[in-house]
Structures are given as C-alpha cells and as structure tokens.
C-alpha cells in the first residue's frame, strides 16, 4: 500500500493543492496520448524496415544465377524474408497495443469526468475557505485599527463624544472579527475533511493510471523481446545454413548442373595420305566473286580430304607475347594467286588466313604521321582486346574460330582518329600534357571498352571481369564536370538550366576546351573527382552533393537581452545529377546511399523525410546519427522530377530538417537594440548592432546585410549615418552593409542613426527587419559524411541566413 503522500503534501497557506492535483489528473490523458503516438511511430519505423527487407529479399532473386556462388543467394533470400516477417509481426503486435492504449484513453476521459463531478464539493470548500480567509484577514485589520484609534483618543484627551463614538466602532469591529473567526473554524473543518478525501481519491487515480501504463510498457517490451529472440533464431539458422553449405557441395552442385559430359576425347591415329585418291577427290575450285569473308557455303564432299604439306599450311610466326609477325610478302600477290577457286569449297580449302594484331611503331609513312608516337601507342593499346597467347595454330583451330576472326578482320585496321567516350587513357596524368597539345582528334570504335590508366611500362591492359556489366556510353550523359554554387535548378524556355555543382576539380588537367568531347550524347570524361561518366565496369562511384542550410529567427525587445526570442532550424538537401537516374533505373538494386550526421549534440530535434529516409532509433551515440535512403522511393521521386523538368542537370531532394537548441541572445550572430524618440515634428532612430562570434562554431563573415525600418508620420526629409535610402512609396528606410566580422571596425559593433522630419507626426515606433547570410559555415556545427561504398561526396555546401530577424523598441 502506497503512503498517503497527496494527503500530507498539498495543503499550504494559499490552499492551492486541489488545483495542482486536479491538473495533474488531467495530464494523465496527455501522457496516454503521447504514449500511443510513441508506439505508433515505432510501428511505422518497423513497418518501413520490414518493407525494405522484403524488397531486398526480392532483389536477391534477381541476382546472377551463374557461377558456383549462385545457390548462396537462396540462403540470403530465405533469411531476409524471415527477418522481414519478424519485423512485420512486431508491427501487428504494436498496432494491437495502440488499440489497447486508445481504449484505455477513452475510459480515462470518462473516469476523469466522473471524478470532476465527485470533487465539485471540495472545489466549493476550497473557494469558501479562500474567501473566508481573506474576509477574516480584513476584519482583523479593521478590528486592530479601531482599537488603536480608541486608545489614541483616550491618550490625547479627546472629547467624551469622540471617545464614545470610537468605542462603538471598536465594539462593532470586534463582533465582526469574532464572527469571521467562528465561520473560519467551521469552514476549515469542512475543508480539511473534503480535501483529505479528495487528495486520497486523486492519489488512487494516479496509482491506477501508473499501474495501467506500466502494464502497457511491459507488453511493449515483451513484444520487442519476443521479436528479437525470433531474429536471433533467424541469424542462428543463417549461420548454420552457411556452415552446412560447404565449398565441396557448391562445386559439386555446379558440376552436376552445368557439366558438359564425362566422355573424354578419343585417340586419333596418324593415317598415311594416298596421293591417288587425293587427286581423284579434288574438284575444280572457283572463289565466289562477291563472297563475304567468313560466310562460305560448305558443300565439300565428306570423302574428300586435303592433306596440305607443311609449306602450304603457311602458319604465321608469332613473337613472345603472342602477336603475329607480319611477313614481307605482298598481300596483293596472295589475292591474285587464289582469285579462282571452287564455288563449293570449304574454308579449309582456301588460302591459309593470316590474322595479325599489331602494334605499329611510329613511322613517317604512317597514316597519322603528325601525331606523337606516344599518342599512337596509347590509342592503339586502348582499343585492342588480347586473346591468350599461343605459339602456333593448326588449320582446324584456325577454322574453328574463323567467324570471330573474320569479323575482327572486317574492321578497319587503321589507327583510330577520334577519342572515344570511354578512352580513359587519354586522361592519364602521365600523358596529360602530350594529349592536350595534340592537334589531331582521336576516335575509337564503339566497341572499345573502358580501360584502366596505364604506366609507361605497361602495354597490355588488364581484362575486365566478365561478371561486371558494362554501361552504355549514354548512361550518364547528364553528368557534367562544371563546378557551380549550390542552388536550385532554374528552368527557362530559352536556355538550359545550370549544371549541378557535383564536384570541384582535383586535377590540373583541363577538358573543357575540347569541343569534340561535349557532344549531346557523349558524356564528358576527365580525371577530376567530379561528376565524370560512371561505368560499373571500372567500379567508379556515383557523385552526390549535399547542402546544409540553416535559418536563424530572432526577436529583440529593446535593449533587454532576457527578452530575446530565438529559433534556429536547418535543412539538409542532397543533389543528384540527372544522369544518375539512368543508373538507378537500369539497376534493380542500386547501392544504398548511407550518410552520417555528425556534431548533433546541439540539436533538439531531427526530422528525416519519412518517405525517403530511414534511421536507427536505437543508436546510442549522442554526437552522431546514421541514416540510409530508400533507393526505390528515391528512384521513383527522381524520375518524377525528371518528367516535370527533363532539361534540369541535377535534382535536389530534401532529406532532413532539424532544430538547434538556442540560448537566447547568445545564439544570435548579430545582436540588435533599437531606440526611438518621437515628437510631433521629428523622429530620432538609433539601431545598435554587435557581431557575436560565440553564436557560431567557427566565426565567419556576415554578408549582404540589409536593415529595413518602416517610419510613418509623413516623412519629408531624412538624415542618416551611414547613408540610407528612403522609399517614399513604402515609407521605409533601407540600410545596406557590405559585411561584418571580427576584423571589422570596433570588432563588428556599430550603430545606424537617422533623423526624420515629419509633416503628420508624431510617428509610432515600429518593428524593423534585418537580413544577412553567411557562406561556408553553420551555427550548429553540424557536418555530414557518406558511409559505405558506391557513392562519393563531391561537394558539401554550408550556409546560414536570416528568417524572421526582427527588433522592437
């Protein structure tokens, strides 16, 4: 049994205990409602997490089913689906708990209404004792005054009549005082009895309320505990499945499902060539005049076998790296010798083909003799694909690969004359100066893949992994390396919008002067870490920019710093280049964009965009908080923005809002105080300002400062220091200051003074407004960094500016 704390502690001289207890009972309804809101928000978070896990499980089904690792995706999918179901079960339990809390809240309201009627008598007793106490105090004071007056008249020797008159008044005051004392005693007894009963009733209500609330909280904690036990079981099951999936079983499963057979090739014995039968089987041969290379009708008799001698094989010589060595024989002679052939001959009966992949050194007679030899070497290397080196090819091997080789042969063998969109070699820092100075444009075929920048000693580019998809050259056509200030896109019918400020250049190499690199369907290529074209083949990261914008709102009342009201809010915006939309839409599961907000100790509240951003409410670090984005929702949102404004080069997405804790006038970067002196003919105004570096984490310059003061009374003339502008139509005075900082005169302190001559005075003091901004800094000191891989932060733009910054006298 709880002690009667309410009965013992809510009396007091002014008898306000009843009012305190009654309002405390009403606050119980607020607590119940807030608890329901808390559980509802938790359910929303769990539901969003469950949906994200479900999407992740579905995306696992779309991953590559090739290779020995493919069966592992089934384990991931099953585990992720179970985790999603666990969180979904928690959502259901929380929703049931919300209904229980709401039901209790309704019962609580009814109970409080009933209690209000029951304690109405106590309220009357409280009012009665408060009234009787005041009346008793007044009667006591009147009684004391009359007695003192009577004694004074006796001592001063007043007339008998005056003394008798004073005695009558004193007796009357005495009777009134005694009457109120008796009434107070009766009222006090009634008040104490009712107040004791009511205080105990209020305590019983609070005990019942707290017991019910604790039961609800216990249900909440048990539900969360059960779900976490299930999650632990899912993780244990995942660990066991991974342990049971051995490397041998994966390899065995791949061999059984993708195996091509267990029969090995048989032995083939050497057979002597019979010249007589070979001559009889030879048919006249004539080559088709318009036959295409590599496309030859096979009509050879199965019994006809040609056994060429060693000389007729004409196997090409190769060097140590697998490249064929060009013979000195003229190719025109070869064509003349084999112009006539059988129309139904097989490719084996044709001339032995010589396929060469050559790196030609610089030669005066070359097609591009004006180019530097180093340029030719680099471009040649950047556009060839090497097969494994072999020493010799048999005729059968040559013919087996004839279709691919003929296609290769059919391509132009001359050096490229134009730089391709994927030629990253051209922007290698080792070769930057020579390539920029070259006057001859370079190109590569459309099939050239992205290559890794090479050193001078590396001649063979490393092969690209086959499992990594290649992006088409137009995937990121909207990503351009043009550093610009962070600002919203501006649409116009006559000019394209400005390009997003995705990065600053990190290299001295310049690519903006090359007109051939800025075609409409060709992404710009560069060595800067800005928004250069991204290829999944070379594991590049996607550029994003972030803006931190804070707004300081303040109201100054006269020169009293205690009356200053301050509110500071902030916004976090992420800017995506327009070309990134194609990357997101072409990839069913783009990398999740995660970011961390640092230095949040001064923030009172953080509100993420619930439709696009998730966070972990269980994070215990008081100075940082991690967030991650719903990439499917972000993709849909960016596509919608793109449809609304397809010409925009980047799109801004609001992800966070926050409020900064303020400490009155100490949190304002510019302190203000106004003084007005109004008369019938003139008005004198003085505005004192003071730069406050303590409001900022790192003191910065306040720029574009404007002060606007409305003045009525029919201003006919204005004298001001520093000079101001008077707008007669708006009846306002305008001051413009270039900038204020610690390095300004008087440490950033000063005054604005003005005298106004009036024709219809006097003026009424009005509220003035101030505007300013500061670039590269925030008041809160909040910072942001990206977490994980897949993205890079090309730019962080920080600024704070005034919202409603007002001053009154």
Curated annotation (Swiss-Prot):
SUPFAM superfamilies: BAR/IMD domain-like (SSF103657). SMART domains: FCH (SM00055). One of its GO terms (biological process) is synaptic vesicle endocytosis. Ubiquitinated. Mainly undergoes monoubiquitination but also polyubiquitination. The modification Phosphothreonine is found at residue 385. Residues 390-416 have a biased composition (Polar residues). Residues 301-352, 390-422, 435-536 are annotated as: Disordered. Functions in an early step of clathrin-mediated endocytosis. Has both a membrane binding/bending activity and the ability to recruit proteins essential to the formation of functional clathrin-coated pits. Has a lipid-binding activity with a preference for membranes enriched in phosphatidylserine and phosphoinositides (Pi(4,5) biphosphate) like the plasma membrane. Its membrane-bending activity might be important for the subsequent action of clathrin and adaptors in the formation of clathrin-coated vesicles. This is F-BAR domain only protein 2. It comes from Mus musculus (Mouse). The lineage of its organism: Eukaryota, Metazoa, Chordata, Craniata, Vertebrata.
């Amino acid at each position: 049994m709880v002690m009667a704390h309410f009965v013992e502690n809510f009396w007091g001289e002014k008898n306000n205990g009843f009012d305190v207890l009654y309002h405390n009972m009403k606050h119980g309804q607020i607590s119940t409602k807030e608890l329901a809101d808390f559980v509802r928000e938790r359910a929303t978070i769990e539901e969003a997490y469950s949906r994200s896990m479900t999407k992740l499980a579905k995306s696992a089904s779309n991953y590559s089913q090739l290779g020995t690792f493919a069966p592992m995706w089934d384990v991931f999918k099953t585990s992720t689906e179970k985790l999603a179901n666990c969180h979904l079960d928690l959502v259901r339990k929380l929703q049931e708990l919300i209904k229980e809390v709401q039901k209790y809240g309704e019962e609580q309201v009814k109970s409080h209404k009933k209690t209000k009627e029951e304690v109405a008598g106590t309220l009357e007793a409280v009012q009665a004792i408060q009234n009787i106490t005041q009346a008793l105090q007044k009667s006591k004071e009147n009684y004391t005054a009359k007695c003192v007056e009577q004694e004074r008249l006796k001592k001063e020797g007043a007339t008998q009549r005056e003394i008798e008159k004073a005695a009558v008044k004193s007796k009357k005051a005495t009777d009134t005082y005694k009457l109120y004392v008796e009434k107070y005693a009766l009222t006090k007894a009634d008040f104490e009895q009712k107040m004791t009963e009511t205080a105990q009733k209020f305590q019983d209500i609070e005990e019942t309320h707290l017991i019910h609330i604790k039961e609800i909280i216990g249900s909440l904690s048990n539900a969360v505990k059960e779900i976490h036990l299930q999650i632990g079981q899912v993780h244990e099951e995942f660990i066991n499945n991974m342990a049971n999936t051995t490397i041998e079983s994966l390899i065995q499963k791949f061999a059984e499902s993708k195996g091509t057979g267990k029969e090995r090739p048989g032995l083939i014995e050497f057979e002597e060539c019979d010249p007589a039968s070979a001559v009889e089987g030879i048919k006249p041969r004539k080559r088709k005049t318009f036959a295409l290379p590599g496309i030859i009708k096979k009509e050879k008799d199965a019994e006809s076998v040609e056994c060429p001698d060693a000389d007729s094989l004409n196997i090409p010589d190769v060097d140590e790296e697998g490249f064929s060595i060009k013979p000195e024989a003229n190719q025109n002679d070869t064509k003349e010798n084999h112009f006539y052939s059988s129309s139904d001959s097989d490719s084996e009966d044709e001339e032995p083909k010589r396929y060469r992949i050559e790196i030609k050194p610089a030669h005066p007679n070359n097609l591009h003799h004006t180019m530097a030899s180093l340029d030719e070497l680099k471009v040649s290397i950047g556009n060839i694909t090497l097969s494994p080196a072999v020493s010799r090819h048999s005729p059968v091997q040559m013919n087996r690969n004839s279709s691919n080789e003929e296609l290769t042969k059919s391509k132009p063998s001359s050096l490229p004359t134009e730089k391709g969109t994927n030629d990253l070699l051209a922007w290698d820092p080792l070769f930057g100066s020579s390539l920029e100075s070259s006057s001859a444009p370079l190109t590569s075929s459309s099939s050239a893949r992205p290559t890794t920048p090479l050193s001078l000693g590396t001649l063979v580019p490393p092969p690209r992994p086959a499992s990594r998809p290649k992006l088409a050259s137009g995937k990121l056509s909207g990503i351009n390396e043009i550093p610009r200030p962070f600002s919203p896109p501006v649409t116009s019918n006559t000019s394209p919008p400005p390009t997003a400020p995705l990065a600053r250049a990190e290299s001295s190499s310049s690519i903006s002067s090359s007109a051939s690199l800025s075609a409409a369907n060709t992404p710009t290529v560069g060595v800067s870490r800005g928004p250069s074209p991204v290829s999944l083949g070379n594991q590049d990261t996607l550029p994003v920019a972030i803006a931190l914008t804070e707004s300081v709102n303040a109201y100054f009342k006269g020169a009293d710093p205690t009356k200053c009201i301050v509110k500071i809010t902030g916004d976090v915006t992420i800017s995506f280049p327009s070309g990134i939309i194609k990357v997101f839409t072409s990839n069913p599961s783009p990398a999740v964009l995660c970011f961390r907000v640092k230095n949040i100790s001064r923030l009172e509240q953080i509100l993420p965009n619930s439709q696009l951003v998730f966070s972990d409410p269980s994070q215990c670090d008081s100075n940082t908080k991690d967030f991650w984005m719903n990439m499917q929702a972000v993709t849909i949102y960016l596509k919608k923005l793109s449809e609304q404004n397809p010409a925009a080069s980047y799109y801004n997405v609001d992800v966070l809002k926050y409020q900064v804790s303020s400490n009155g006038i100490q949190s304002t970067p510019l302190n203000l105080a106004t003084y007005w002196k109004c008369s019938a003919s003139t008005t004198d105004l003085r505005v004192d300002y003071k730069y406050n570096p303590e409001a900022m984490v790192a003191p910065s310059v306040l720029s574009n400062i404007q002060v606007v003061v409305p003045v009525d009374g029919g201003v006919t003339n204005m004298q001001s220091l520093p000079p101001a502008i008077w707008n007669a139509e708006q009846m306002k005075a305008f001051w413009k200051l270039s900038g204020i900082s610690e390095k300004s005169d008087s440490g950033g302190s000063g005054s604005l003074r003005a005298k106004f001559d009036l024709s219809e005075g006097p003026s009424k003091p009005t509220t003035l407004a101030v505007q300013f901004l500061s670039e590269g800094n925030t008041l809160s000191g909040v910072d942001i960094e990206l977490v994980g891989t897949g993205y890079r932060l090309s730019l962080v733009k920080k600024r704070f500016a005034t919202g409603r910054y007002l001053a009154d006298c």
